[in-house]
Each structure stands twice: as structure tokens, then as C-alpha cells.
Amino acid sequence: MSAPAPSTSTSAATRIVIAGAGPAAQALVAQLDRARFAGTITMLSNRDDTPEKLLELAMLPQVSVRFGQPASHIDAAKRTVATADGMEFTYDQLVIATGSAPVANPVDGAAQCLSYATIDDAPRIADGVQAVARELGRRPVGILVGTGAAAGQAEAVLRAKGVRPIRTTARPAAVIPAVVSAGSSSPFAASAVVFEDGSSMTGDLVVLAEERVARDGLAASAGLRTAAGGGIEISRDFRTSVPGIWAIGDAAAFDGVRLGLLVAAASAAGACATQLLSAASAAPAAPVLQAAA
């Protein structure tokens, strides 16, 4: 999806607050900057570390990143957001991008294998398959662990790359990568997974596609509607049930489905940025998301 058209007609007094600082939030700020948004943007981050991308955004003159100050309370009537340490921020438009969290506890060694949580993970899965295939000189044997829509999408990506994965819903306890040869181009080759029942499976690569739940507690406590299966309910233009509040990324749900499984973060950010610019200038913009048939 293309970036929103540059706009210099937005009010310089418009204040956008973003609850969250993950990939979706970062993409949104980048899109607003690209469109020359003239107001102010405040990002409330639960991170104490300073990843490079976030630091780059913090250098923008209209952007303030509050590291280690996650949003803890929304007063929709007053249009304010408070943090756990008592800071309060007034907004004209609030975007909730608090992401999602795994349902189960982390799996030991998960960093040594591939994972699938959103559409944005598809390119990394494809690249991992290609790297392992080059290393082995053949199609790799893949093990896919997980259930639900994320596992279904991960399987589709693997099959598109010529891998017929062995799929299991058993709960993994640990991922154990085999020792790779010197000069290996892939950290994912010849992996194994051990399950909680003591059984194990060995393959050339392991993909974890475990269930995740939207971090929608902040929104729910402010009276926003949430989906039965989790996630902040949004309309086709990313608006929530409360005026002036929007949601993107894995915290949101459209038509009952976690947004990260429907649209890439960058695409959602670009579309939401267009809507925010439209709201700031009081000019209507066309909706983007389409309900499932």
C-alpha cells in the first residue's frame, strides 16, 4: 500500500498519542512523518531499551518517545492518557497499538527457530526456508508446531516454498538446534523440538506458530468494545467504538480476527495515517478494510 499523500493542511495543534511502540506504532509514525504531519506525536512505550528504529523516530522534531512509560489509563471523556508513573497526556486522536502476547509460557530455545505470529513474519519464514535449502542442497523437512489461523498461514507459506511440514499441536517444551558446520549460512538447519510429554521430533527447521492474545486490557478498561476472542473492535477505517480512539496492529480485531493475521503492519499503518490526517483536516477518507464474506 502506498504512503498517505503529503498534507500540510492539518492543524499544527493536532496532538496524536500512541499507546505502544512496537512495529505497528513505529510504522504509523514513519507514515505520518512521510506525509509531513504538522502536529505532535507522543509514543508511550513500555520498553526501557532503545532499539535503533525507535531512536530514529525519537529524533524527529514532532515526535516524543516516552521510554518505559506505558499507558495505564484512558479517560475518553477528557481525552487524556495517564502512565503508571502519573504522567498525563492530552490527545486529539489516540491510537492504541499495544500488540499481543503469547497465550502460553515462552518455549526454551525459541529464538533458535522460526516463528509465525502475524503476516509480517511470512517473508522471514520464506527466507529461512531458502537458506536451509541452500545449506542442505535439498528441500528441508519442516516441523510446524501450533494451532489456529496463525499455524494455517504458516503452513501455506511453507508449502509455497516447497516444504510439506509435519504439523503437530503438541505443546513444545524446548527447541534444540543441532550443531551447524563452520561457515553455515543458516542458524535454523537440523533443528529438533522436545514436547512436554517427553516425545520429540527432528527436522531441518522448526516453525512455532503458537496462539496469541491481544493486549486489549487498556482499551477494555476505558469502555472500548472488544471482540469475543480478544482484540479491540475496529471498523473498516480503524476507528474503535469510542470517538477519537483508533487501534492498529495485533491489539486490534476486525470482523473477529486479530488484525495482524489480516494485514501487514506497514499497510495498516499507511491506511490509518491517511484516516488520521483526514480526521485532523475534517476531510473524509475512504475506508480500507473489508468484512469477510
Give the ranges of each region predicted by the language model.
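FAD-binding core/adjacent interface of flavoenzyme oxidoreductases
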Residues: S2-P6, A13, R34, M43, ...
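A conserved FAD-binding loop/helix module that cradles the flavin
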Residues: I248-A293
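FAD-site-proximal beta/loop scaffold in flavoenzymes
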Residues: A111-A133, S200-A264
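Intrinsically disordered, low-complexity terminal tails and inter-domain linkers enriched
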Residues: A3-A12, P123, Q130-P140, A173-A189, ...
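A Rossmann-like FAD-binding core segment of flavoenzymes
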Residues: V65-I74, K78-T83, F89, G152, ...
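Beta1-alpha1 glycine-rich phosphate/pyrophosphate-binding loop at the start
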Residues: S2-V65, R138, G142, A149-A174
